[in-house]
């Protein structure tokens, strides 16, 4: 259950950024979660709600954006590998054009706080 540690890191990151910007309240947080992280967005959202209780984050809206896997293959294919082509227990990715495994993953591994909307002190 690596969702708990990731949710904790997200909460700490957001609280730190909010405090550095003199926030009195965090209104909204947008988080990008790559498909290759194998993080469950519903579990992340639940844990974010639980971990934010009693903090400046309590009551904030969490927007979780799932980032699809994008590759650059040696065959020349550049694009998204559809989610239904992934085995969620042991992700094996292959190029949809040539079936090969020699490629660079451009997106889908990230777990980033993309945006934080705060209310500042008057």
Swiss-Prot record:
> Which amino acids does the record list as binding Ni(2+)?
2
A GO BP entry is:
protein modification process
InterPro entries tied to this protein: Hydgase_Ni_incorp_HypA/HybF_CS, HypA/HybF
Keywords annotated in UniProt: Metal-binding, Nickel, Zinc
- Positions binding Zn(2+) in this chain are 73, 75, 95, 98
Q: Which GO terms describe its molecular function?
A: nickel cation binding; zinc ion binding
What is the stated purpose of this protein?
Involved in the maturation of [NiFe] hydrogenases. Required for nickel insertion into the metal center of the hydrogenase.
HAMAP family found in the cross-reference section: HypA_HybF
UniProt lists the family membership as follows: Belongs to the HypA/HybF family.
The entry's protein name is Hydrogenase maturation factor HypA
The record's gene field reads hypA
């Amino acid at each position: 259950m690596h969702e708990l540690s990731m949710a904790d890191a997200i909460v700490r990151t957001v609280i730190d950024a909010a405090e550095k910007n003199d926030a009195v309240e965090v209104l909204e947080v947008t988080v990008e979660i790559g498909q290759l992280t194998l993080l469950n967005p519903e579990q992340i959202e639940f844990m974010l709600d639980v971990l934010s209780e009693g903090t400046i984050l309590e009551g904030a809206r969490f927007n979780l954006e799932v980032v699809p896997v994008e590759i650059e293959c040696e065959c020349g294919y550049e694009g998204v590998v559809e989610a239904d082509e992934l085995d969620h227990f042991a992700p094996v990715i292959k190029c949809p054009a040539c079936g090969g495994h020699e490629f660079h993953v451009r997106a889908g591994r990230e777990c980033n706080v993309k945006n934080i909307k705060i209310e500042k002190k008057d």
